[in-house]
């Protein structure tokens, strides 16, 4: 007998697994049943069973899928699950692999919630850029919750313990039931009507089922939270519960106590921080003073301080150098200016009227001298000529003639008589000799 016709257990399980995978009806199965053997495992995969009146099937829900479940599963709870069927090879058993789980009977609510969430998300109500920063030191805090629940008590106790300065004002509202949404909106509008009276608002309630928390998923409540003029902290249900108020609020707290902690600083921590900063500031200042003192001592003990004049040696030398440069520069400028002045003066003199006048004066003097010399020469010549003429005249002068013994005669009128025709008898005539005159009377005229 040969072994070839016998399958191994692994081969058989693999074959059956492939049958399950290739069956289109088992790829995505919608299953309803009652939770059985459910034991919550924190941060782990969940293993339980689903059963009805006649049958039971083992279920595995991996952590990545279970973290998305929006309610708290409990033993005996009827649920809707979606997943696929496959074989677990090591044990040779088939089981259901759940990918989604909802409480039975709440599917319509979940669908409504998803649709509203998608609508508001599309409008941008949940966008991070709309989230406002919580004030660090609030003066007044408004709280919207039930007046009779533990929420307001936890908030006031925590806030008074952490930051007694803050004033807590309750705006009571119904947090469950058909009229809860209207009551919540009315309370928030009362707060908004007071403008900037409040620094922050807390809205919340304790845990409950999806139906119990449904008023915090109503559209008018969510929009009013978004429209509040101050930052809003939402604390609705337990940590596993998430409402649309949580998504639209500026901050979400898992518990009322956590909400109060978000809203207020811890005064003791702040004082401790102040004291720490004060100590660091004093230490820093003291360290700075010590450093400055050490530096001052080093400066006081330096050679420069012991011989202060050395502090200015380089500066004095630099001043001397600059002074010499300045003097040289001034001298050069003066020399250049003088040279330019001389050149300009020479050029001016070359075209100056004074020089021309001086030349003309010089020429005048020369011409005057030449004229004077010429005049003297001319006069000398004329004197010589005059002397000759005088000599000639003197030679021909009547006086000379008189000296030779001749006389000349004038009548009584002083006219010279040169002819006997000018004389009559009894005329009185003056006879001029070289040394005198003689008056004579004509007694006779002869020719």
UniProtKB/Swiss-Prot annotation:
The disulfide bridges present are: none
| Chain coiled-coil ranges | none
Catalytic EC class: hydrolase
Enzyme Commission code: 3.1.11.6
Residues making up the signal peptide according to the UniProt record? none
Name the GO cellular-component terms: cytoplasm; exodeoxyribonuclease VII complex
Question: Where in the cell does this protein reside?
Answer: Cytoplasm
Keyword terms, alphabetized: Cytoplasm, Exonuclease, Hydrolase, Nuclease
Spell out the reaction equation it catalyses. Answer: Exonucleolytic cleavage in either 5'- to 3'- or 3'- to 5'-direction to yield nucleoside 5'-phosphates
InterPro entries (UniProt xref): Exonuc_VII_L, Exonuc_VII_lsu_C, OB-fold_nuc-bd_dom
Q: Which GO MF terms are attached to this record?
A: exodeoxyribonuclease VII activity; nucleic acid binding
Pfam families in alphabetical order: Exonuc_VII_L (PF02601), tRNA_anti_2 (PF13742)
Query: Principal place where this protein is found?
Result: cytoplasm
For the biological process aspect of GO, one term held by this record is: DNA catabolic process
Primary role: Bidirectionally degrades single-stranded DNA into large acid-insoluble oligonucleotides, which are then degraded further into small acid-soluble oligonucleotides.
Q: Which PANTHER family match?
A: EXODEOXYRIBONUCLEASE 7 LARGE SUBUNIT (PTHR30008:SF0)
- Quaternary structure? Heterooligomer composed of large and small subunits.
Q: Which family does it belong to?
A: Belongs to the XseA family.
Q: What is this protein called?
A: Exodeoxyribonuclease 7 large subunit
> Could you tell me which species this protein originates from?
Lactobacillus helveticus (strain DPC 4571)
Its gene name is: xseA
């Amino acid at each position: 007998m040969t072994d070839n016709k016998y399958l191994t257990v692994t081969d058989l399980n693999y074959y059956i697994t492939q049958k399950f995978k290739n069956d289109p009806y088992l790829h995505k199965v919608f299953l309803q049943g009652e939770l059985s053997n459910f034991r919550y495992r924190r941060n782990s995969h969940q293993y339980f069973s689903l059963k009805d009146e006649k049958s039971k099937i083992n279920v595995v829900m991996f952590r990545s899928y279970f973290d998305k479940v929006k309610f708290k599963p409990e033993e005996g709870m009827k649920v809707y699950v979606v997943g696929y069927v496959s074989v677990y090879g090591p044990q040779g058993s088939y089981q259901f692999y759940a990918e989604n789980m909802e409480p039975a009977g709440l599917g319509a609510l979940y669908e409504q919630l998803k649709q509203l969430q998608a609508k508001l998300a599309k409008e941008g109500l949940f966008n991070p850029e709309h989230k406002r920063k919580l004030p660090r030191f609030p003066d007044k805090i408004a709280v919207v919750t039930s007046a009779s629940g533990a929420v307001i008590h936890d908030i006031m106790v925590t806030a008074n313990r952490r930051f007694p300065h803050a004033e807590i004002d309750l705006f009571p509202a119904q947090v469950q039931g058909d009229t809860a949404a209207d009551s919540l909106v009315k309370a928030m509008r009362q707060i908004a009507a007071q403008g900037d009276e409040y620094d922050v608002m807390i809205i919340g309630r304790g845990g409950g089922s999806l139906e119990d928390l449904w008023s915090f998923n109503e559209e008018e409540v969510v929009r009013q939270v978004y429209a509040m003029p101050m930052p809003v902290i939402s604390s609705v249900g337990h940590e596993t519960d998430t409402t649309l108020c949580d998504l639209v609020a500026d901050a979400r707290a898992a518990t009322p106590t956590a909400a109060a902690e978000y809203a207020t600083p811890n005064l003791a921590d702040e004082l401790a921080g102040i004291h720490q900063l004060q100590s660091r500031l004093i230490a820093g200042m003291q360290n700075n003073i010590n450093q400055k003192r050490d530096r001052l001592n080093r400066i006081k003990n330096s050679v420069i301080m012991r011989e202060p004049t050395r502090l200015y040696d380089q500066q004095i030398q630099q001043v001397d150098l600059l002074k010499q440069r300045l003097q040289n520069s001034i001298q050069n400028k003066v020399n250049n200016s003088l040279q330019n002045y001389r050149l300009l003066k020479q050029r001016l003199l070359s075209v100056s009227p004074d020089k021309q006048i001086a030349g003309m004066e010089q020429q005048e003097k020369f011409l005057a001298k030449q004229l004077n010399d010429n005049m003297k020469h001319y006069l000398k010549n004329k004197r010589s000529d005059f002397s000759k003429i005088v000599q000639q005249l003197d030679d021909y002068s009547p006086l000379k003639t008189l000296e030779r013994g001749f006389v000349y005669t004038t009548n009584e009128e002083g006219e010279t008589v040169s002819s006997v025709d000018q004389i009559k008898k009894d005329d009185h005539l003056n006879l001029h000799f070289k040394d005198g005159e003689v008056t004579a009377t004509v007694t006779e005229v002869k020719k």
